Amino acid sequence: MSGGLEILKLTEGDITKMLSANTHLGAENTNFQMEQYIYKRRSDGINIFNLRKTWEKLLLAARAIAAVEHAAEIFVISSRPFGQRAVLKFAAHTGATPIAGRFTPGAFTNQIQAAFREPRLLVVTDPAEDKQPITEASYVNIPVIAFCNTDSPLRYVDIAIPCNTKSAHSIGLMWWLLAREVLRLRGSIPRDGKWDVVVDLFFYRDPEEVEKEDQAAKEAAAAVPTPKQEPLEYGVTGASEWTEAITEQGGIQPSWADESLPGQPTVFPASNIDEWNTTAQPAAAVKPSEEWNAGRSGNWGTSATGNW
């Protein structure tokens, strides 16, 4: 569906990605409806897809997806573990509704159950594995897009994208290419630019391998030695030196700290003692009065009113 346009043709970079992910390798068995997409057969019995036809059907599927007004009405389904992560990533970038895992029977036909949905378009990973949603879609006239291998059944499939559905990398790459073309047709990303989302995010990852990688990362982090911090010393260095220097000068100069501490004698320099007047007599001590009201006036209550 490139229409002979140079901008829609398959690029060398996309061909390299497909060959690296073994997208061109099919199965040994062949469905008669898939023979038109086969380029040749190898000596070991493996069928090889024509990647140009794969690209043309991918563009057709992207145009059908981009034509749907509300992206949430597009359902992407994968019951196989290899395609569940790719389906979730595709839905996150395009706004489609993902169904990763087991499909609930009757979700498209039984209006009584809570999981009932009415999609406008259905995209499945493998027609052989996702047979139930394809069959229900045929009952309610929902168009179906499917990634098909050489031996995949094409019954009720409207747009078949020929590719290798047995490889986890091939499934992830095809979902990545489909998401990129949909975003290009919508105008979300430029066609002549590079999409900043790497294809590795669409690949399947074994949970055991992920757990092993996390464990190895924790062990590596624990093996890194923690720098030891030396205790801080709060002692004042050189205290004896400045104490001896002040003693040689004849005393300590008064400061505001001496006034704030009551009862602490103030030490003045020895050079200033000779200048003081030593002839002054101390003041006479005042003997306290024995009468408790001696200092008060005689009529101390006259300030109040008479009848209080």
UniProtKB/Swiss-Prot annotation:
Write out the entry's keywords from A to Z.
Cytoplasm, Ribonucleoprotein, Ribosomal protein
Q: Name the residue ranges with Polar residues bias.
A: 299-308
Q: What is the lineage of its organism?
A: Eukaryota, Metazoa, Ecdysozoa, Arthropoda, Hexapoda
Key word Cytoplasm present: yes
Q: What does this protein do?
A: Required for the assembly and/or stability of the 40S ribosomal subunit. Required for the processing of the 20S rRNA-precursor to mature 18S rRNA in a late step of the maturation of 40S ribosomal subunits.
A molecular function (GO) term: structural constituent of ribosome
Subunit note: Component of the small ribosomal subunit. Mature ribosomes consist of a small (40S) and a large (60S) subunit. The 40S subunit contains about 33 different proteins and 1 molecule of RNA (18S). The 60S subunit contains about 49 different proteins and 3 molecules of RNA (28S, 5.8S and 5S). Interacts with ribosomal protein S21.
Q: What cellular-component terms does GO give this entry?
A: cytosolic small ribosomal subunit
Top-rank lineage group of the source organism: Eukaryota
Ranges for the region named Disordered are: 283-308
> What compartments host this protein?
Cytoplasm
Does this UniProt record's set of keywords contain Coiled coil? no
- What name is this protein filed under? Small ribosomal subunit protein uS2
Name its species: Maconellicoccus hirsutus (Pink hibiscus mealybug)
Q: Which GO terms describe its biological process?
A: ribosomal small subunit assembly; translation
What is the protein's major site of localization?
cytoplasm
Extract the InterPro entries matched here: Ribosomal_uS2 (IPR001865), Ribosomal_uS2_C (IPR032281), Ribosomal_uS2_CS (IPR018130), Ribosomal_uS2_euk (IPR027498), Ribosomal_uS2_euk/arc (IPR005707), Ribosomal_uS2_flav_dom_sf (IPR023591)
Give the similarity note: Belongs to the universal ribosomal protein uS2 family.
